[in-house]
């Protein structure tokens, strides 16, 4: 059945020179499943025809089918993939490639076979996140919002959080090792010393001296959301916040006349509200009452406090205008 159907498809689409789509759609789902079954089943006749027509053409279709069913695939499917013609550069409707899928679905064993087929860790998805971005986000989400990791209709529900802390750390380590060994030249944001300081993890060989790239040009890719300047620009963590989540807000009421303050909690403040950067009036002669509301949660407070530290070892490896906000708690 697969043979006859596949030959018919090849006759009508490949031999006639009609280019098939790279992405899986409902219209072509049946076609992609048939081709995929023949490839995984190592049907020699079909494989020979695909090789004759050109591996690059078949590559797009096979890789698209592979992405479509990646969540339910096992390592055996990956190992049985013939000719190593699957491409890690093919993306799905979300702009994610195979490496993104490995991070999302906790398939760390798949990453061990990535170097044999080639890869590019610098491909962003539609949200602008590389695989390393996703690994960091999983770790930050898991440590910042442990009670909401199973919330519906959020990114937390998309990412599998089984053994979240351990798996996220493993993914970051594996991805960084791949960066060191195979792709040292990527548009990074921070230098190696900064990354090693916060990761407390020394990548395996080769060491820095074995890399021909200058140390100043070799900077690991940290999430954009962890920059202090992002807090100043957006005044919120909207991209990290689960939709509809409520959090407590501390209302601090200062009375300059009596020189004391009263703190109350407001649990009806929405997480998406921006941080109100109002400054208190320091005029002691004023008898007016000044009230300010801050919406810092535990993560905000820790990151702000961390950015104000005077640790000499940190200042030596960080630029003054770009302070990394990933503390030990999140690593």
From Swiss-Prot:
Record InterPro entries: Ankyrin_rpt-contain_sf
| Organism domain of life | Bacteria
Q: Determine if Cell membrane is one of this entry's keywords.
A: no
Tell me where the ANK repeats sit in this chain. 94-159
Which key words tag this protein in UniProt? ANK repeat
User: Sorted alphabetically, which PROSITE patterns does this protein's record hold?
Assistant: ANK_REP_REGION
Does the record bear Cell wall biogenesis/degradation in its keywords?
no
Name under which the protein is recorded: Putative ankyrin repeat protein RBE_0261
